[in-house]
A protein has these predicted regions:
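Short, surface-exposed "cap/lid" segments of acyl-processing enzymes
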Residues: 2-68
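Alpha/beta-hydrolase active-site loop
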Residues: 84-104
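Gly/Ala-rich beta-loop-alpha elbow adjacent to hydrolase catalytic centers
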Residues: 113-122
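A conserved short beta-strand
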Residues: 130-142
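Acidic catalytic loop of the alpha/beta-hydrolase fold
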Residues: 142-143, 166-173
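Short alpha-helix in the alpha/beta-hydrolase fold that links the catalytic acid
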Residues: 149, 173-183
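Short beta-strand/loop motif that positions the catalytic acidic residue
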Residues: 156-157, 162-169
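C-terminal catalytic histidine-bearing segment of alpha/beta-hydrolase fold enzymes
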Residues: 189-257
Length: 257
């Protein structure tokens, strides 16, 4: 078994929201999306600048799509990049970010949107009262272990939940996110999952479609905007259909014109 040495205590640093994606806002904020970058299972190293930068294109796309409703997007800066076992540091930082967003903007709906281990953090921190929606992209979820408690799902009750996973992801197992979605669907019917055929962990091959789906989901969840038929069908379909919904090539292209 590999052993990991933490470099400096995560608690010596503080998580941060920083400036909103797209610059300072001049209009009223009607909702917030908190973007949670990928991380590492065990590490005390400073949060990755590369992982932070990887969330910016999605943040910009969501901010543009939700500008008329006053959507603010922030990429959360973790104390450190590691989940770190039962400490679940990334989830703790995500919970802090929700509290900070409410302090900063008032009583507005919040969506947690994470990638990789940030996806796990988004799902875990969903129990915060202000959270109305959770988007988990290629989420890193643990293997089933009879000696450990399964990844919790009760905190998702009352939230709208979307998981998106590439079928060729070599870093995080898409089958584990499917199993998680199965359990989550039993606790919370407003759960669905899309599969991106032949795409990998970074979801680069169909990035435009993934961003369009994310915008549809976030704006529909936070502001009750009408959403595309595939998303409606996925939410309504029983397992496994609504948990293995294929993301069609060109999804959202008509809206992008």
């Amino acid at each position: 078994m590999a052993h990991f040495a933490l470099v400096g205590p995560p608690d010596a640093r503080r998580p941060r929201l920083g400036r909103p994606v797209g610059g300072s806002r001049t209009s009223a904020v009607g909702g917030v999306v908190l973007l949670l970058p990928d991380g590492e299972p065990m590490s005390g190293r400073r949060a990755s600048l590369r992982a932070h930068a990887a969330m910016l294109p999605l943040g910009r796309a969501l901010e543009r799509a939700g500008r008329s409703e006053g959507l603010a997007a922030h990429v959360v800066r973790y104390r450190a990049r590691g989940w770190n076992g039962t400490d679940a540091d990334l989830a703790a930082d995500a919970s802090w970010a929700v509290t900070e967003a409410v302090r900063r903007y008032g009583d507005v709906p919040v969506c947690l949107a994470g990638h990789g281990l940030g996806g796990r953090a988004a799902l875990r921190a969903a129990g915060q009262e202000a959270v109305g929606a959770v988007l988990a992209l290629a989420p890193w979820l643990p293997e089933d272990d009879v000696a450990a408690e399964p990844e919790p799902v009760r905190q998702l009750v009352g939230r709208r939940v979307l998981l998106v996973h590439g079928t060729n992801d070599a870093r995080t197992d898409p089958e584990l996110s499917f199993r998680f979605a199965e359990r989550a669907k039993k606790a919370n019917r407003d759960t669905c999952r899309f599969e991106v055929h032949s795409d990998g962990h970074a979801l680069r091959q169909y990035a435009a479609e993934v961003r369009a789906l994310a915008a549809d989901f976030v704006l529909g969840s936070l502001f009750a905007r009408p959403v595309a038929r595939p998303l409606t069908d996925a939410m309504a379909a029983p397992p496994p259909l609504g948990l293995r919904m294929p993301l069609a090539v060109g999804f959202g292209s008509a809206r992008r014109r």
